[in-house]
Amino acid sequence: FLGNEILKVIGVQGIPTLALSRRPIVNLPSCADELIIDFNAISELEIQNINHLYLSLGYPLYFHNVMGFMSKVLKEDLFLVDFTYQLEIAKKAKEAGAQGISLISAVGSNSHSRNHYLKTKGMLESEIMELDFESINIYQPGHLRGNKSRPDILFADAISIFVDPFMFGSLSKFRSISAKKLAEVVASCLLYTSDAADERNS
């Protein structure tokens, strides 16, 4: 969902991109190539000439799951996708020469949180920081608006429109953001990173 939005923005900019996916991507930009992979075999993945990695994998959850109500199996599945897969991909990208990484995490992420979702996000952030990329962008958005395929998210979108204006000060970080807007922010950072790298190498 969010990854597709970022691909759209990057496509407009014409930035060469390699998109990793489980299945073929609809409306893939002409500047992008896709690589269909088995996420259970990331150790066998071979990629080259990567400059910047964007990570936005996330196990599909419902609101009550994010709030902490998860079965043991769901916790294991979440950890596998949100932590293990993403960390393995980050390490592969680093080996392939990636200088920068952009990670979509979550507001309130904390490796010491009692909330499994937020703890998992925080643990991944800590591990990514240890990989020593030259440029690390970690985004911690609140609720992401715009996923029209999920009725529960559409409901949350509507609630956000009324609640967001009342979130001031320390609460402002919990405001929702449209996936399209976040994608534009992420892509702008990628452009800035690319331009900075070109200047260093010129």
Give residue spans per PLM region.
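N-terminal Rossmann NAD(P)H-binding glycine-rich loop of SDR-like oxidoreductase domains
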Residues: 1-11
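Oxidoreductase cofactor-interface core, primarily capturing Rossmann-like NAD(P)-dependent enzymes
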Residues: 13, 111-194
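N-terminal Rossmann-fold cofactor-binding loop
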Residues: 20-24
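Single conserved hydrophobic/aromatic residue that forms the stacking wall/gate
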Residues: 192-202
